[in-house]
């Protein structure tokens, strides 16, 4: 009896198992999408980690290690700072009248002339850097009653004592230093930058030896501004054998304005003016070497590609650069949701569609068909739905780059010690800006990823619905992304379904007839469950009957004795 029940159970399972293609009068057609063994995790709005078939890194995290000299004109400061080149330090004479897009200052740069300070150093440096030129025009200033072209052993030009080439050190002539009053109009149509200075002697004796008066004064004026400087006499730390100093100042004279210089001593006079230009030139501190290459974006670490929308190499940039963010990585989904293919599909090797898993090895497209029929099995891509998805995804990266790439430079921020509060505020604003951009970048990528996954899922569903509408009652949805076709469907028939030329009316009668025949003997999963339960109950009942009969027989034969104690 048990043998009969077991065989009945196996027979039922066999009848309940679908054999795609095992009947010449039916076929199975499955729809699926591309999958890879190991996908890439991306972030979406609804999921922190979702696996996709392909993704593109959006954050540039490394530089080339060198500053490219094309397309930007790079001027290497070598041993000179921009201000030393501006003043005309003897070892910076090679920079006279130079131009640049980006002036690169090196950490090894040094001054090699009379010790000086610039009270508004950062502003002057930024002003000259943005002008992009050291073009200098000499002017005929008349300094009557004084000696010109003073020099110092601390500023040698060759073997001789020298001075800054763009400045004129004036001191007494004989025993007199008259009051100087010189004017210079700007009759041109551009701004002129005048550099001048005030000498601070280390002792009163040095003051009178050079300028006669015990205390000098320098006043420089235009129609828009006036600066009056009184020298501060006193000893300072020794630099290149000197304890005196020069303070450097600057004045911009606009077209139609006039420069007025008045002094009774201590004047370091201008020799002319620098021609100011408007532009987007800049300056950057960097020790990266300058190489022969092409790059639109430059950082102190070196040039970086700008084919990504974000970078975390350096906050300081020049050129058309990716936006700086805090994240080390942001991945943009450029493929669909990845569901790796199951390697085994049961004892009969049935195929399955997109609802269960993806398909690996699809090289001709993202979406496609697999079939089993009387001629065997096959697979083909659906190029139309694949192209529809690709067309919408292809432009995503370019659109993100267009939204984020900066077409201007982010300059270094410098403040003097007395501007500490301003510097703190600026740093807070800059950090807040970076935080906001980092958040916006993550949100933007998550939104784009969500859209990509929804889009690719939608294309799969569109293809499935298109196939369902073609087959109509000639096939049954198996619930796993496959259709069981109730008529003979050879490879030509399968091809007509794929390309949209399938005529369901041609196969309607055959499909209807086969459906009724198959349904008459096909056991649904619900009936199989009932058979399993009934078989189990009968088996248990028979086992109990056999066991009880054995016990009764053994008792009668005396092989088993039962004692009941109270």
Swiss-Prot record:
Residues 17-530 are extracellular. Residues 1-16 form the signal peptide. The keyword Membrane applies. Glycans are attached at residues 24, 38, 54, 79, 97, 181, 301, 499. Disulfide bonds join 30-482, 68-293, 80-92, 113-155, 297-321, 489-493. Residues 552-566 are cytoplasmic. It comes from the Viruses. A lipid is attached at residues 555, 562, 565 (S-palmitoyl cysteine). Palmitoylated. The chain crosses the membrane at residues 531-551. InterPro entries: Capsid_hemagglutn (IPR008980), Hemagglutn_HA1_a/b_dom_sf (IPR013828), Hemagglutn_influenz_A (IPR000149), Hemagglutn_influenz_A/B (IPR001364). Its main location: virion. GO terms for biological process: clathrin-dependent endocytosis of virus by host cell; fusion of virus membrane with host endosome membrane; fusion of virus membrane with host plasma membrane; viral budding from plasma membrane; virion attachment to host cell. Keywords: Clathrin- and caveolin-independent endocytosis of virus by host, Clathrin-mediated endocytosis of virus by host, Disulfide bond, Fusion of virus membrane with host endosomal membrane, Fusion of virus membrane with host membrane, Glycoprotein, Hemagglutinin, Host cell membrane, Host membrane, Host-virus interaction, Lipoprotein, Membrane, Palmitate, Signal, Transmembrane, Transmembrane helix, Viral attachment to host cell, Viral envelope protein, Viral penetration into host cytoplasm, Virion, Virus endocytosis by host, Virus entry into host cell. The keyword Disulfide bond applies. It is a single-pass type I membrane protein. One of its GO terms (cellular component) is host cell plasma membrane. It is found in: Virion membrane; Host apical cell membrane. Homotrimer of disulfide-linked HA1-HA2. Major glycoprotein, comprises over 80% of the envelope proteins present in virus particle. The extent of infection into host organism is determined by HA. Influenza viruses bud from the apical surface of polarized epithelial cells (e.g. bronchial epithelial cells) into lumen of lungs and are therefore usually pneumotropic. The reason is that HA is cleaved by tryptase clara which is restricted to lungs. However, HAs of H5 and H7 pantropic avian viruses subtypes can be cleaved by furin and subtilisin-type enzymes, allowing the virus to grow in other organs than lungs. Belongs to the influenza viruses hemagglutinin family. This is Hemagglutinin.
């Amino acid at each position: 009896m048990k043998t009969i029940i077991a065989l009945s159970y196996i027979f039922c399972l066999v009848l309940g198992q679908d054999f795609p293609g095992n009947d010449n009068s039916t076929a199975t057609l499955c729809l699926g999408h591309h999958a890879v063994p190991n996908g890439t995790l991306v972030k979406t709005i609804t999921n922190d980690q979702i696996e996709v078939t392909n993704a593109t890194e959006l954050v540039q995290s490394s530089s080339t290690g060198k500053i490219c000299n094309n397309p930007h004109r790079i001027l290497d400061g070598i041993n000179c700072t921009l201000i030393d080149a501006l003043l005309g330090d003897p070892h910076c004479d090679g920079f006279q009248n130079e131009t640049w897009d980006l002036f690169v200052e090196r950490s090894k740069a040094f001054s090699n002339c009379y010790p000086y300070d610039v009270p508004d150093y950062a502003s002057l440096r930024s002003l000259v850097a943005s002008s992009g030129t050291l073009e200098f025009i000499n002017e005929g200033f008349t300094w009557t009653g004084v000696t010109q072209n003073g020099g110092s052993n601390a500023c040698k030009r060759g073997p001789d004592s020298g001075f800054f080439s763009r400045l004129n050190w004036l001191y007494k002539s004989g025993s007199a230093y008259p009051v100087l009053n010189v004017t210079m109009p700007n009759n041109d149509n551009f701004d002129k930058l005048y550099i001048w200075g005030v000498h601070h002697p280390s002792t009163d004796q040095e003051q009178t030896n050079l300028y006669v008066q015990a205390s000098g004064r320098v006043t420089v004026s235009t129609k828009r501004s006036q600066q009056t400087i009184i020298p501060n006499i006193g000893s300072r730390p020794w630099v290149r054998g000197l304890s005196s100093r020069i303070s450097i100042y600057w004045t911009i004279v606009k077209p139609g304005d006039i420069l007025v210089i008045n002094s009774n001593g201590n004047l370091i006079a201008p020799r002319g003016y620098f021609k100011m230009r408007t532009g987007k030139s800049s300056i950057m501190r960097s020790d990266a070497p300058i190489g022969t290459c092409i790059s639109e974006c430059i950082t102190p670490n070196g040039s970086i590609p700008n084919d990504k929308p974000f970078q975390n190499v350096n906050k300081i940039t020049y050129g058309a650069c990716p936006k700086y963010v805090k994240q080390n990585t942001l991945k943009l989904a450029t493929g669909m949701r990845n569901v790796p293919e199951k390697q085994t599909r049961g004892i009969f090797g049935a195929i399955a569609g997109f609802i269960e898993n993806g398909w690996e090895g699809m090289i001709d497209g993202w979406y496609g068909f697999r079939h089993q029929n009387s001629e065997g099995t096959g697979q083909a891509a659906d190029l139309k739905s694949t192209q529809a998805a690709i067309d919408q995804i292809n432009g995503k990266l370019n659109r993100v780059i267009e939204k984020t790439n900066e077409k201007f430079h982010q300059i270094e921020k410098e403040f003097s010690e007395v501007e500490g509060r301003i510097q703190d505020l600026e740093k807070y604003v800059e950090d807040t800006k970076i935080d906001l951009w980092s958040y916006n970048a993550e949100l933007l990528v998550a939104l784009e990823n969500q859209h990509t996954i929804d889009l690719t899922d939608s294309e799969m569903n569109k293809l499935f619905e298109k196939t369902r509408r073609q087959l109509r009652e000639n096939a049954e949805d198996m619930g796993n992304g496959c259709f069981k076709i109730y008529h003979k469907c050879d490879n030509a028939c399968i091809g007509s379904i794929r390309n949209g030329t399938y005529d369901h009316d041609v196969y309607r009668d055959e499909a209807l007839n086969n459906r009724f025949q198959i349904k008459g003997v096909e056991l649904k999963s619900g009936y199989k469950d009932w058979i399993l339960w009934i078989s189990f109950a009968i088996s248990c009942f028979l086992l109990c009957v056999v066991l009880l009969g054995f016990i009764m027989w053994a008792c009668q034969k005396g092989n088993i004795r039962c004692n009941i104690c109270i």
